[in-house]
């Protein structure tokens, strides 16, 4: 069984975000388990020390990392894939690990400490995306790749 954990920073999400996440998570059939870990964003204001906030959020992310998972940071500077390339990449990753952990940062992204811990860095787009939407785009992309691997008609 492939486990996919998504660690993300964020506060209470709108219903449409939760609906989108749940919709794609339930589409995966037997053999793939999806888990979302949401870490509350630390409070920010105009005088916030963003470096200190990033450091604290990094500690919370590190505490949530599952043991023995392949860590993949979502980062603007990461590698991007077409749907077919992502399907191939997922096939390769399943040979390496039975647990993939995707990490989505907050408004300031991820700290260098977290990026260094990760085995890979992926980018979903060159666009700046709202962090709540990234959850849905990631799951849809993974589902599409799974559909390609399994010759499911979703991708066609």
From Swiss-Prot:
HAMAP family: 23SrRNA_methyltr_H (MF_00658). Specifically methylates the pseudouridine at position 1915 (m3Psi1915) in 23S rRNA. Homodimer. It comes from the Bacteria. SUPFAM superfamilies: alpha/beta knot. This is Ribosomal RNA large subunit methyltransferase H. GO terms for cellular component: cytoplasm. Its main location: cytoplasm. Belongs to the RNA methyltransferase RlmH family. It catalyses: pseudouridine(1915) in 23S rRNA + S-adenosyl-L-methionine = N(3)-methylpseudouridine(1915) in 23S rRNA + S-adenosyl-L-homocysteine + H(+). InterPro entries: Alpha/beta_knot_MTases, RlmH-like, tRNA_m1G_MTases_N. Pfam families: SPOUT_MTase. S-adenosyl-L-methionine binds at residues 74, 105, 124-129. GO terms for molecular function: rRNA (pseudouridine-N3-)-methyltransferase activity. Keywords: Cytoplasm, Methyltransferase, rRNA processing, S-adenosyl-L-methionine, Transferase. Transmembrane segments: none annotated. It is found in: Cytoplasm. Its EC number is 2.1.1.177.
